[in-house]
Amino acid sequence: MAPSPSKRKERSEDKAKERGKEKAPGKEATDKDRGRDKAKKRRSASSGSSSSSRSRSSSSSSSSSGSSSGSSSGSSSSASSRSGSSSSSRSSSSSSSSGSPSPSRRRHDNRRRSRSKSKQPKRDEKERKRRSPSPRPTKVHIGRLTRNVTKDHILEIFSTYGKIKMIDMPVDRYHPHLSKGYAYVEFEAPEEAEKALKHMDGGQIDGQEITASAVLTPWPMRAMPRRFSPPRRMLPPPPMWRRSPPRMRRRSRSPRRRSPVRRRSRSPARRRHRSRSSSNSSR
């Protein structure tokens, strides 16, 4: 038998309910999943806020500690930067001085070099003078001679030691035929002068012991260049109002007036004398 329409409706309703029931758990599952996601998001948000607050507090504490440490580190960094800058400036100055010296230093260096160059020839001259041996003497001084000894006697005695170039025997002013007691003998070779010194120093001439000594030749004197002084400038005459007239003119123009000498009058004495004479005559 064919089912009735009412049964058909019931069956269709049941099927729809079953389908709805089947769909409901899927929806519930999706709703549950959505709720879980929302709860997770809320938890994550709450945990994020708490962590942010914690991080803020920690960041504030760390910032305070960081500021203190930053100040100390800043001071140390500033000190280090200063030291670094000073060291860098020193290194730069040293490098600049080693690389390219300043113009003032160049001038000082040039002056020192010029001074050292100018001093070198003087040193060379001194060293040459020290190194160069002194010339050997050829002149002999003979002292403590008696007045009886003449040039001929000295020539006869000292010619035995070599060729004599010159004999200088000063004479006394007041007694021209007598010597002053000493003489100079100049030989041609220094060896001859040394031989005469060896034999005649402490020897005897005319019964008296004499002395013989070498005369050192002086160094040739260099003629110093004369420095001509500039001519003196004549001072201009003083102005008229400053000129004072000479004293002679003053005296001639205004001679001194001598006050007349006061003389005592002799008239009262005469009167007295007359009065006395008259009194005597009356008596």
Curated annotation (Swiss-Prot):
Residues 1-140, 223-283 are annotated as: Disordered. Keywords: Cytoplasm, mRNA processing, mRNA splicing, Nucleus, RNA-binding. GO terms for biological process: mRNA splicing, via spliceosome. It comes from the Eukaryota. One of its GO terms (molecular function) is RNA binding. InterPro entries: Nucleotide-bd_a/b_plait_sf (IPR012677), RBD_domain_sf (IPR035979), RNPS1_RRM (IPR034201), RRM_dom (IPR000504). Its main location: nucleus. Residues 104-120, 128-140, 244-276 have a biased composition (Basic residues). Residues 45-103 have a biased composition (Low complexity). It is found in: Nucleus; Nucleus speckle; Cytoplasm. GO terms for cellular component: ASAP complex; cytoplasm; nuclear speck; nucleoplasm. SUPFAM superfamilies: RNA-binding domain, RBD. Residues 161-240 form the RRM domain. Residues 10-36 have a biased composition (Basic and acidic residues). Belongs to the splicing factor SR family. Component of a splicing-dependent multiprotein exon junction complex (EJC) deposited at splice junction on mRNAs. The EJC is a dynamic structure consisting of a few core proteins and several more peripheral nuclear and cytoplasmic associated factors that join the complex only transiently either during EJC assembly or during subsequent mRNA metabolism. Putative component of the spliceosome which enhances the formation of the ATP-dependent A complex of the spliceosome. May participate in mRNA 3'-end cleavage. Also mediates increase of mRNA abundance and translational efficiency. Component of the active spliceosome. This is RNA-binding protein with serine-rich domain 1-B.
